[in-house]
Amino acid sequence: MKGMKEYIKKLEEGSDLSSEEAEAAIGEILSTAEDEEIGAFLLALRAKGEKPQEIAGFVRGMKQAGNTIKPVTPFRVIDTCGTGGDGLNTINVSTAAAIVTAAAGVPVAKHGNRAATSMSGSSDVLEALGIKVDLTPGQVRKTIEKIGIGFMFAPVFHPAMKRVAGVRKKLGVRTVFNILGPLTNPAGAKGQVVGVFDKKLCEPIAYALAELGTEHALVVHGDGMDEISNTGETFVAELKDGEVSTYTITPEAMGMLRAKPEDIKGGTPKENARDLLCIFKGQKGPKRDLVILNAAAALYVSGIVGSIRQAIPIAEDAIDSGKVMVKFNQFRNFTAELSIQGKKEGSCPGEAFLASSDTSVLSPASGEKA
């Protein structure tokens, strides 16, 4: 069996690792490898460039080393997650889009972490909104099944990642770990919208997702953002039915006005939380349009509509009808109850809240409760 030294040598020679070798390497990195070996491996891989089978192997290895859940849901579970690192400091688009998507009836297993390069990460803004993010895996599964949305806080689900934190900080450059987060969804989401900080990553990540068994995914880079953009063109690598295709979309093609970058700027977690609440309550403008575009993409990969454009009215209605605020309040209240009382083994302390609330999932495709 090969070890880290062999993997490092192979990478330094410019050769690609097989998916199995990549999986074994990440297993060593997250367990027994020395810091010097980890640093050399990451730098050699960065110099060579990551290939789809390597990315897929790393993802498998990370999932093996972490915690996973299998929520039972009426529809395909989806995730909206970006790599971050675009340096544009927008509002928390994928987090807002996740709540809108859940309000439209699609179960969401949102994966995220604290801010690394921006002022506000997904967990930061959720905490500012009063949502508990440090739930156990079992509690998150209950939240997805009962409410239709759950947040999987990366340190809870990938505790072994703390082994590489020091090395990554010391290296001071982007490594493969900067792109693995959105791909290691602990709930095994089969539909994904993945935002990336570099257009060149779109196709390799789409092919990696294909190898990992993802059913439908959009890997996007929009006008410098790790989101679908309403300020310019968005490059998309779409994985569907095992095939990857690429194309570009514009705000105008989606029936939306083109915005200016300053119109969608974010701020601190509290400032972004305020912006998200305004959007949820129906305030119109470029920030709402940006959230709707990305929620529509999530609805598309869920399989309930045939295109992003077809999903836009569904996302708009979820906000304007008040469903989004209802879903947000359910999410906040249920996670609060679980956080306070959920340590009792085998109990589901949110049942009292559920009994007094209409939390049934409404299918936008049929209008029937499921």
Swiss-Prot record:
GO terms for molecular function: anthranilate phosphoribosyltransferase activity; magnesium ion binding. Pathway: Amino-acid biosynthesis; L-tryptophan biosynthesis; L-tryptophan from chorismate: step 2/5. Its EC number is 2.4.2.18. Anthranilate 2 binds at residue 168. Its cofactor is Mg(2+). Anthranilate 1 binds at residues 82, 113. Mg(2+) 1 binds at residues 94, 227. It catalyses: N-(5-phospho-beta-D-ribosyl)anthranilate + diphosphate = 5-phospho-alpha-D-ribose 1-diphosphate + anthranilate. 5-phospho-alpha-D-ribose 1-diphosphate binds at residues 82, 85-86, 90, 92-95, 110-118, 122. Mg(2+) 2 binds at residues 226-227. Pfam families: Glycos_trans_3N, Glycos_transf_3. Keywords: Amino-acid biosynthesis, Aromatic amino acid biosynthesis, Glycosyltransferase, Magnesium, Metal-binding, Transferase, Tryptophan biosynthesis. Catalyzes the transfer of the phosphoribosyl group of 5-phosphorylribose-1-pyrophosphate (PRPP) to anthranilate to yield N-(5'-phosphoribosyl)-anthranilate (PRA). Homodimer. This is Anthranilate phosphoribosyltransferase. It comes from Methanosarcina acetivorans (strain ATCC 35395 / DSM 2834 / JCM 12185 / C2A). The lineage of its organism: Archaea, Methanobacteriati, Methanobacteriota, Stenosarchaea group, Methanomicrobia.
